[in-house]
Amino acid sequence: MKYIQVEGVGQVSRIGLGTWQFGSREWGYGDTYASGGARDIVQRARALGVTLFDTAEVYGLGKSERILGEALGDERAEVAVASKIFPVAPFPAVIKQRERASARRLQLDRIPLYQIHQPNPVVPDTVIMPGMRDLLDEGKIGAAGVSNYSLARWQQADAALGRPVISNQVHFSLAHPRALDHMVPFAERENRIVIAYSPLAQGLLGGKYGVDNRPGGVRAVNPLFGTENLRRIEPLLQTLRDVAAEVGAKPAQVALAWLISLPGVVAIPGASSVEQLEFNVAAAEVELPTESRDALTEAARAFKPVSAGRFLTNLVREKLPF
């Protein structure tokens, strides 16, 4: 495993574990997964050197935090647990109250990384961040982070906090490389981290899906899996397959290895089984030659998906009986 030392948080593994599916039903894992599989995954993750575990108060309406806290057991205070507050009425007193509720569910006295889940379109960070600053001053959290913030808003949050907002968790993968342009350079320059969620684009970068093998379930409504986008992304998937063959890994592992080869970037894929977790963690050992990494970056930049509106139009046309 590879690590980044993050001020206030500690040693952060470059491959972490996203736990949005803990306690949720939309991915079809169910109660057995929550009570047994999730615990086994977390414990195996620790054995493999994973230290970053990401959750949020809204995941399973608090169930994810409870399951994670119980699964970590006595090690819960020794790892980089990251949770998030959804910014409804994000005033200082409310933020402090809800952080304490998350800490109780996680069975922690101190949450290493506490993040604003998304920008509030009405309430500015000058109102939100004083509550985060109080939590820092009181030692209730180790560091403040944000999620789904633009670079400009991240910088505004910095100014409002009066100290570094250490992380920004964003949608980032070879299929969604927007963070490459400005966010990654900023993180490198300012000694911050970018936390990549959906790093495998819901499995698209594993190479399993294509025009002739469309997914069902929640993936079916993801524009990336539309027919036109599956055609457009094929050159990127072929580059992934070529690099994977070159380095002796699987395409999904190469996709993760590309992310964590970038300065200040860590990835938090989910896992539905211990085997999938082990597969993801193995990506930390994949070394990409410079030429291969550059080829992947070029292919990612070249992929231009159709808009969500066009995806919906195409989807309706495909479903019509003529």
Residue spans of the language-model regions?
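Active-site groove signature of glycoside hydrolases
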Residues: 103-122
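Short, well-ordered coil/turn segments that N-cap beta-strands
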Residues: 9-15, 49-52, 76-79, 108-112, ...
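Beta/alpha (TIM)-barrel catalytic core signal, keyed to glycine-rich beta->alpha loops juxtaposed to Asp/Glu
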Residues: 3, 119-308, 312-322
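Conserved beta-strand positions
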Residues: 17, 55, 83, 113-116, ...
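Active-site mouth loops of central-metabolism enzymes
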Residues: 23-36, 83-93, 117-122
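N-terminal binding-site loop/beta-alpha segment at the start of enzyme catalytic domains
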Residues: 1-79
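Acidic (Asp/Glu)-rich catalytic clusters
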Residues: 7, 69-77, 100-108, 136, ...
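Short, acidic/polar
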Residues: 31-45, 91-106, 150-155
